[in-house]
């Protein structure tokens, strides 16, 4: 059976929708694009008119009632932001906006500026009302940024939408976050083949290929977005929410294999910047996730449960 695909640029990412050819496949692609545009309007921290930005604009003013999808992602993000030693913090928006790494107006904030902004990045300042589905940022100038989670969450929503249409197989690649569902009918073992980027080399160079089925692969790396300041130093985009500066780490890339793409987002962010020992121990302790760690000097570490998926 022939694969058909549609690629669009949205939310600062290239998005691939891959389905097997079937009746009305082009209309299905059109409907998915409409959904993606709707989710951009809901989750984006870079669109001043998005539903998320309505929360941010009302920081220190009043609670904002939001769609259940947005509320659920914020609720999930807050839980994992408050976890011990987590490097995920959805309240880090002011720090991200200060650096702007990945945008044309990127800069290096002053230390005084960063220290002042850190005072309004405590996720405890996010007040949630489950019955009303309202979100209130209790400090002025607070900002939620869901950039570490939204792509995976949206990919999962799209997969659920396609399954509800009765579509049995497909693949979504949302800016490098890959989620598959159903059998890969074009492969004898019915598994999809996903290349894992070598973070120490140019894009398209893989450290391995993974065989996956009804699973997601999410990779985070310091190679993705960088900025060279007037001081001549190069800064990557993965910020440490505790210091306000790019995380200092021996890790160049971290890949998480999970059932849900949002879980891959959560754990790549929670773990990136931890020691290799901590990351590998966590991967062995949590049965729902597997992973691959690549260091800046090119060493590769695999969790035990992922080894039978690796094609080198």
Pin down the residues of each PLM region.
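Mature catalytic core of soluble alpha/beta enzymes
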Residues: 1-312
């Amino acid at each position: 059976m022939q694969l058909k695909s549609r690629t669009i640029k949205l939310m600062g990412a290239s998005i691939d929708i891959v389905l097997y050819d079937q009746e009305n496949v082009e209309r299905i692609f059109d409907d998915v694009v409409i959904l993606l545009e709707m989710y951009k309007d809901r989750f984006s921290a870079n669109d001043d008119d998005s539903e998320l930005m309505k929360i941010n604009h009302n920081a220190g003013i009043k609670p904002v009632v939001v769609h259940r999808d947005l509320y659920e992602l914020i609720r999930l993000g807050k839980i994992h932001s408050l976890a011990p030693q987590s490097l995920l913090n959805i309240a880090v928006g002011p720090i991200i906006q200060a650096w702007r790494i990945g945008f044309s107006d990127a800069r290096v904030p002053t230390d005084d500026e960063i220290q002042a902004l850190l005072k309004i990045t405590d996720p405890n300042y996010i007040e949630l009302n489950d019955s009303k589905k309202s979100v209130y940022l209790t400090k002025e100038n607070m900002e939620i940024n869901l950039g570490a989670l939204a792509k995976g969450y949206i990919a999962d929503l799209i997969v659920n939408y396609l399954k509800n249409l009765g579509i049995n197989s497909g693949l979504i690649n949302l800016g490098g976050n890959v989620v598959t569902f159903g059998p890969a009918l074009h492969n004898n073992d019915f598994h999809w083949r996903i290349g894992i980027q070598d973070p120490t080399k140019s894009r398209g160079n893989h450290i391995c290929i993974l065989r996956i089925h009804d699973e997601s692969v999410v990779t985070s790396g310091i190679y993705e977005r960088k900025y060279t300041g007037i001081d001549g130093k190069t800064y990557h985009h993965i910020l440490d929410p505790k210091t306000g500066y790019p995380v200092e780490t021996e890790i160049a890339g971290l890949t998480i294999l999970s059932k849900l793409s949002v879980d891959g987002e959560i754990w790549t962010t929670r773990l990136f910047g931890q020691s290799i020992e901590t990351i590998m121990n966590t991967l062995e302790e949590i049965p729902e996730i597997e992973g691959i760690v690549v260091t800046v000097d090119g060493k590769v570490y695999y969790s035990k449960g992922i080894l039978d998926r690796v094609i080198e």
